[in-house]
């Protein structure tokens, strides 16, 4: 299932939730390293996205990105937001509220181009559970909610 950022997706089944939690647990237990790896992969594969992060200006190599405290801080925030979604899979209202707030910040305060949510979600999905339709469905849910303020 390709990741989408508009429309709607079917609710996650109990089996999909179980599989997502199993795939996510080892990732989140090492969230600092994994988060940085995900963000570095995102920026090296999509350098135009870096323009929305003024603190990352001048960081042009993967090594520079990995060593940046600002990159590490933002990577942690991203991983924690995904973790919040994983934890909230049984409470979609809570997930909608948290990600809706995050959408508003990205749309109004940071003016991030929403096309990059789907690109980053694909990097996360590939890192966590490559090819798993349930995890891709969760990433789609996140992307749709992150676009809600646009």
UniProtKB/Swiss-Prot annotation:
Molecular function per GO: heme binding; iron ion binding; oxidoreductase activity; oxygen binding; oxygen carrier activity
Entry-linked SUPFAM superfamilies: Globin-like (SSF46458)
Residues involved in heme b binding: 74, 106
Matches recorded under Pfam families: Globin
PROSITE patterns named in the record: GLOBIN
Residue ranges of coiled coil: none
Annotated Gene3D superfamilies: Globins
Record-annotated Globin domain positions: 11-150
Swiss-Prot/TrEMBL keywords: Heme, Iron, Metal-binding, Oxygen transport, Transport
Family label: Belongs to the globin family.
Further remark: This is one of the minor globin component of Sea lamprey.
Subunit structure: Monomer.
Protein name per its UniProtKB record: Globin-3
Organism of provenance: Petromyzon marinus
